[in-house]
Amino acid sequence: MHDKYGPEAKFAVEAEALLPTTKHEEEIARGLELGLPGADSIKDRRIPTFSRGELPHFAGINTFGKAPYVEDVRKCGQYDVAILGAPFDGGTTYRAGTRFGPQGIRKISALYGSYSFELGVDLRESISMCDLGDVFTIPANIEKTFDQVSKGVSHVYASGAFPVVLGGDHSLGFATVRGVAKNLNGGKLGIIHFDRHVDTQDTDLDERMHTTPWFH
């Protein structure tokens, strides 16, 4: 049937057939162990009593992509990718509110599956992810917030995990890059920046903020 829809459909069907299900099966087993087997009336015995995984998308604690929450940040090196929120909007010039960005991103991410039909890749099967929660930002002090974010990112990077930061306003780009750079021993760090503006001012309204991160 997929032949009549063209090569993209053919690729999607064939790629999906080759996907491993190891992580999916491990998540089911973990859910049954930690969340108790489902009630006797539940016919699908893969469903636990307490939600302990990706499903259902409308339930559970809000982490990015329903990844496991890791309270002990010293253990983040056990994962390929570590998510950390940076709820800070003290670097905005005009419109506040992005401090609630990490909450919003986590909430909406629960509605999305991990499989890309275009790429033939299942994120949950390809890498291991965890969510470390949020960096303790300082609303009244942008420089102290930068220090906090840089330390958090540096810790994750040094552990061997890849840090993904959920902001937060644009000023946090500086703190994020600085956190990675601390581990490069003078090596080069590339930046791919998508924005309407280049954000390379020295200062804005006499401060380092959302229009200045790449100057510094």
Residue positions per predicted region:
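Conserved alpha-helical scaffold segments that buttress catalytic/binding sites
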Residues: 2-216
